[in-house]
């Protein structure tokens, strides 16, 4: 409710009066007055119209309204009047009747069955006598010089901060001899101020001069408290300067534009004048603002409650209850901390903390409120609570939504600037940006826009701002996910051991290591459980390389993961090391960590605690260390699975059996795929660079690593010098692929996937000029067949457990080496063929999985035709526009999906096949060469195992293949018999037909048929020409090959369409 409009009648607050009917007034009014009031309603003895800023009281006799200043009634005393009589009615009915008290306030409050009212003398006495949890458990006590933006960023400004001396805070204050009369002098005695009646917990208006008289009066009938005297626009503002940290963080100080049409919020400077026993009930500062208090004289006691979700819900229910002044909110929560702020001390209360204030002695203090970016989400949450509680505008942050729009625009600029400069925003800024964007969406919804559009600045384009901010947040979060596990706590600002030389003041019972600059001890340090070994190892792993040396007295920090895992895996034994263990880990170590058996023969290690005492930790025995090493290795491997939920797995190929556990149970490790060329975080290379608020001290670098390199940091040390797939290797590969001029480029090379795409586009653009040299063509043929070697070897190696260095290098990627007497003939042939292929590669680069041939490779190398035919299963071979159509070998075990056959295509193929069979029979009878007829008959007869198939497509010229090969190359060694024509119709439906003139095609991968691309290719064949010369008869044009004849029979148009 607006206090300036409050009107009191018999102690009750009433709305402004309605215009009076002047015809019913008493005869004390003159005719002149009646005529004047007929047009404009007037009141009181002064006959003035209604003034919203002046206090008025109603007469119970004549029902007229009078100004308190005109009839001599003060607003704070009006509540004690039972029946008020105006000066005119006083003559007829006597003086006003005051309320009758049934006894003293003490007896009234302590009456049986009557609850104690908040703010009453009894309430204050009971509050003084109660005990609360000490605030030393939660508050921080840095010096003024330590309280910087970096300090708050590291600790997120989530707990109160008490600075014992104002030195280093950078604020200006009057001398301790400054009094309330001096405040009146600088502000003015006529300044109207809001005053709280503590006993009634009600607000009233007073002039500052009247309050000063009350303050210095010998007898105070009431307890009045002034907590909302904002003096930014007075002369007192020149004597008070807010702390430097507040000026750096405040939104109003830094982001409110000078030319804004909205009124600038003035909430930075307040003067608090409180008499003894003043009490302010529990509240959250308006708009979720943080607040600073400096006690110039006297003392104040703060009762602090942490803003957890449960406590905020209880607070909202308590604030909306009808008997709020009969319940002490501190009794409803689990923890309520008591913090006493004495003269000369400064307290900073963070966003959302619920607090009440008691003044034990007369006190003069200064303070102020400010919004900041360290906890935007909590500020918005507090603002929503205010709206749900229907808090009056007078007690809310002025133009809160307006400043939020300006801040959203500012955060967007920060994100863009940092991204362009390859620098990272801090995590609190990202969370704040997300919370702001959600609030913007809620405020601009169609149904809610009328209530919020008045506070939207004209210079802000709301829709575009929401869209751009969401995009930047999405980009930043992608970078965050890519850097999880790669760097040690880059984006989270909570550090285990913040760097600093000056220790903070903390309770004596805290047992944190003296190196730590910040600790949040529990209420009872002896009851705090120590960390278990696994938790300690996880913390040490997250800490990474941030830990530094503790001191010269033999206190060294050490990376526990390096000590346990690396030494155990390399040598099997442990070196002596000193560990950085917090005091919490040492408390009750015998009870909470029974697994850590100590050997009394080992040399102890002394640790100096923050309280000056020493503790000795005995080294672990050799057998115990071996067990712990296994546990640590397991924990480290399981920690890699944290990334599982952050990324989408493309295929089952990412599932590998980790072989490092030996005889232990094999753990299924998920290797997440990371996109290439994403920004990575690296330590800032410029030590002189000034870090901006909201930025992390790390740069962004372009990453050119492959998927294997993303996990190389975890398993790289386990192998013996395995460097396959590293950055240097990939850069070399890029140079091999790019050609001789590629090294002259100034830009960084593209990733292998990009190079493969470039190769495909170049091949499509240079179809006629790609068959240049035999050497390059052999490389291309090897590339086509090499894919299936790697896939076959990976499938053969999957599921094997080996402790050899080779298997540790790339688990699941190498084939199993068998003794000579175990190998079959086909395996020996494959091994010999692979050796020949590797020899033919020459200087072409290759790594553990891939080969990177040059762009001039071709498939027409005659050297490849001399190699033995063997079955290839490279389904993932890259498409090449130069590749010939290769026969698809039957896959007996391949499941056929139901509903995938096209009836029209099947019917057409069946009819065409039948017609083809008849034509071939007729041609065979008319041919002069009798030698070919037995072969044709053999082909025409269906094989026994294919009798159950619906259709068999014969190709009569395939039988001539052995003879054609003999003319160009020697006979290959014998191998298992392959049948190019067997298989169901599903094997030939969507794939190319077998070719009788390409013997080397058996070494290639299966290529899917693409109408218009493969079937229309016409290439002259050396084998076909020799065959024609030997026969002495030249076939018709366009019918030289079986593919051409089949295309003619099936009526396949040259554009690749199948005409049925």
UniProtKB/Swiss-Prot annotation:
A zinc finger (PHD-type) spans 41-92. Gene3D superfamilies: 1.20.58.1360, Cupin. Fe cation binds at residues 283, 285, 355. Keywords: Activator, Cell cycle, Chromatin regulator, Dioxygenase, Disease variant, Intellectual disability, Iron, Metal-binding, Nucleus, Oxidoreductase, Phosphoprotein, Transcription, Transcription regulation, Zinc, Zinc-finger. Binds 1 Fe(2+) ion per subunit. The keyword Cell membrane does not apply. GO terms for molecular function: chromatin binding; histone demethylase activity; histone H3K27me2/H3K27me3 demethylase activity; histone H3K36 demethylase activity; histone H3K36me/H3K36me2 demethylase activity; histone H3K4me3 reader activity; histone H3K9 demethylase activity; histone H3K9me/H3K9me2 demethylase activity. Phosphorylation at Ser-69 and Ser-120 are required for dissociation from chromatin and accumulation of H4K20Me1 levels during prophase. GO terms for cellular component: nuclear membrane; nucleolus; nucleoplasm; nucleus. Residues 101-115 are annotated as: Linker. The modification Phosphoserine is found at residues 69, 120, 651, 722, 804, 826, 834, 854, 857, 880. One of its GO terms (biological process) is regulation of transcription by RNA polymerase II. It comes from the Eukaryota. Changing residue 315 to S: In MRXSSD; abolishes histone methyltransferase activity; reduces transcriptional activation activity. The keyword Ion transport does not apply. Changing residue 69 to A: Impairs phosphorylation by CDK1 and dissociation from chromatin when cells enter mitosis. Histone lysine demethylase with selectivity for the di- and monomethyl states that plays a key role cell cycle progression, rDNA transcription and brain development. Demethylates mono- and dimethylated histone H3 'Lys-9' residue (H3K9Me1 and H3K9Me2), dimethylated H3 'Lys-27' (H3K27Me2) and monomethylated histone H4 'Lys-20' residue (H4K20Me1). Acts as a transcription activator as H3K9Me1, H3K9Me2, H3K27Me2 and H4K20Me1 are epigenetic repressive marks. Involved in cell cycle progression by being required to control G1-S transition. Belongs to the JHDM1 histone demethylase family. JHDM1D subfamily. This is Histone lysine demethylase PHF8. It comes from Homo sapiens.
């Amino acid at each position: 409710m607006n206090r300036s409009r409050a009107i009191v009648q018999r102690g009750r607050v009433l709305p402004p009066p309605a215009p009076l009917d002047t015809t019913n007034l008493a005869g004390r009014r003159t005719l002149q007055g009646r005529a004047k009031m007929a047009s404009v309603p007037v009141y009181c003895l002064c006959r003035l119209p209604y003034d919203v800023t002046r206090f008025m009281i109603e007469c119970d006799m004549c029902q007229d309204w009078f100004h308190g200043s005109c009839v001599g009634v003060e607003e704070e005393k009006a509540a004690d009047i039972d029946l008020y009589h105006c000066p005119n009615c006083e003559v007829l009915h006597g003086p006003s009747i005051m309320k009758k008290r049934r006894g003293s306030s003490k007896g009234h409050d302590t009456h049986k069955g009557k609850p104690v009212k908040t703010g009453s003398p009894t309430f204050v006495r009971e509050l003084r006598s109660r005990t609360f949890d000490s605030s030393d458990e939660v508050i921080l006590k840095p010096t003024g010089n330590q309280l910087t933006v970096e300090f708050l960023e590291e600790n997120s400004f989530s707990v109160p901060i008490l600075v014992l001396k104002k030195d280093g805070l950078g604020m200006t204050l009057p001398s301790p001899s400054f009094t309330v009369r001096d405040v009146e002098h600088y502000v003015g005695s006529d300044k109207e101020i809001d005053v709280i009646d503590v006993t009634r917990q009600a607000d009233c208006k007073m002039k500052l001069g009247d309050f000063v008289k009350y303050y210095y009066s010998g007898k105070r009938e009431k307890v009045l408290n002034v907590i909302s005297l904002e003096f930014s626009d007075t002369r007192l503002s020149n004597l008070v300067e807010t702390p430097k940290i507040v000026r750096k963080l405040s939104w109003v100080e830094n982001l409110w534009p000078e030319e804004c049409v909205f009124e600038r919020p003035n909430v930075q400077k307040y003067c608090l004048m409180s008499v003894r026993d003043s009490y302010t009930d529990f509240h959250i500062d308006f708009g979720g603002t943080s607040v600073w208090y400096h006690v110039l004289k006297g003392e104040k006691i703060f009762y602090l409650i942490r803003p957890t979700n449960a406590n905020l819900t209880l607070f909202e229910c308590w604030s909306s209850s009808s008997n709020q002044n009969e319940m002490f909110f501190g009794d409803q929560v689990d923890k309520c901390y008591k913090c006493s702020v004495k003269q000369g001390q400064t307290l900073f209360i963070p966003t959302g903390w619920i607090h009440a204030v008691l003044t034990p002695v007369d006190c003069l203090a200064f303070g102020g409120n400010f919004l900041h970016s360290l906890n935007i989400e909590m500020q918005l949450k507090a603002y929503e609570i205010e709206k749900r509680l229907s808090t009056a505008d007078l007690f809310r942050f002025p133009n809160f939504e307006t400043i939020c729009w300006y801040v959203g625009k500012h955060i967007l600029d920060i994100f863009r600037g940092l991204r362009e400069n390859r620098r990272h925003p801090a995590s609190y800024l990202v969370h704040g940006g997300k919370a702001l964007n959600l609030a913007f969406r809620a405020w601009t919804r169609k149904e809610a826009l009328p209530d919020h559009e008045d506070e939207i600045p004209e210079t802000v384009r709301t829709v575009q701002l929401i869209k751009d901010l969401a995009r930047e947040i999405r980009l930043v979060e992608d970078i965050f996910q890519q850097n999880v596990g790669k760097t040690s706590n880059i984006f989270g600002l909570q550090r285990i051991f913040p760097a600093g030389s000056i220790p903070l003041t903390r309770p004596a019972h805290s047992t944190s290591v003296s190196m730590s600059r910040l600790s949040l001890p529990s209420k009872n340090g002896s009851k705090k459980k120590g960390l278990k070994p696994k938790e300690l190892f996880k913390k040490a792993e997250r800490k990474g390389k941030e830990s530094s040396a503790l001191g010269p007295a033999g206190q060294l920090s050490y990376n526990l993961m390096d000590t346990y895992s690396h030494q155990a895996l390399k040598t099997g034994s442990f070196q002596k090391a000193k560990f950085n263990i917090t005091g919490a880990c040492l408390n009750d170590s015998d009870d909470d960590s029974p697994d850590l058996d100590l050997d009394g023969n080992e040399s102890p290690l002394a640790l100096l605690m923050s309280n000056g005492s020493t503790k000795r930790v005995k080294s672990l025995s050799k057998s115990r260390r071996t067990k712990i090493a296994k546990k640590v290795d397991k924990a480290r491997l399981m920690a890699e699975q944290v990334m599982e939920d952050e990324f989408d797995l493309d295929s089952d190929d990412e599932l590998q059996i980790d072989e490092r556990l030996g005889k232990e149970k094999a753990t299924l490790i998920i290797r997440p795929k990371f996109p290439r060329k994403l920004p990575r975080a690296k330590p800032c290379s410029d030590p002189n660079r000034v870090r901006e608020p909201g930025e992390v001290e790390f740069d962004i670098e372009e990453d050119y690593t492959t998927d294997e390199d993303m996990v190389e940091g975890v398993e790289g040390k386990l192998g013996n010098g395995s460097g396959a797939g590293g950055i240097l290797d990939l850069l070399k590969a890029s140079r091999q692929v790019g050609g001789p001029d590629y090294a002259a480029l100034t830009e960084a090379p593209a990733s292998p996937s990009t190079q493969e795409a470039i190769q495909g586009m170049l091949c499509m653009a240079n179809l006629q000029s790609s068959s240049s040299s035999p050497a390059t063509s052999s490389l291309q043929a090897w590339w086509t067949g090499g894919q299936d070697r790697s896939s076959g070897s990976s499938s053969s190696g999957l599921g094997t457990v080996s402790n050899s260095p080779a298997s540790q290098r790339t688990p699941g990627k190498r084939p199993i080496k068998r003794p000579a007497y175990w190998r079959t003939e086909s395996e020996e042939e494959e091994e010999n063929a692979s050796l020949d292929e590797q020899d033919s590669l020459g200087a072409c680069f290759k790594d553990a999985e891939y080969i990177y041939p040059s762009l001039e490779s071709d498939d027409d190398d005659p050297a490849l035709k001399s190699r033995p035919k063997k079955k290839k299963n490279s389904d993932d071979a890259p498409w090449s526009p130069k590749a010939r159509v290769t026969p698809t070998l039957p896959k007996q075990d391949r499941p056929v999906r139901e509903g995938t056959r096209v009836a029209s295509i099947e019917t057409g193929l069946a009819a065409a096949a039948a017609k083809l069979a008849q034509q071939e029979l007729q041609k065979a009878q008319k041919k002069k060469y009798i030698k070919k007829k037995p072969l044709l008959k053999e082909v025409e007869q269906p094989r026994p195992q294919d009798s159950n198939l619906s259709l068999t497509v014969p190709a009569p010229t395939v039988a001539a293949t052995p003879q054609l090969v003999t003319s160009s190359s020697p006979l290959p060694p014998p191998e298992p018999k392959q049948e190019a024509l067997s298989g169901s119709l599903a094997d030939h439906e969507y794939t190319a037909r077998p070719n009788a003139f390409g013997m080397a095609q058996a070494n290639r991968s299966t290529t899917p048929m693409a109408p218009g691309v493969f079937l229309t290719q016409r290439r002259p064949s050396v084998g076909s020409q020799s065959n024609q010369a030997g026969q002495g008869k030249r076939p018709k044009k366009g019918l030289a090959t079986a593919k051409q004849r089949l295309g003619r029979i099936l009526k396949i148009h040259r554009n690749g369409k199948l005409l049925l």
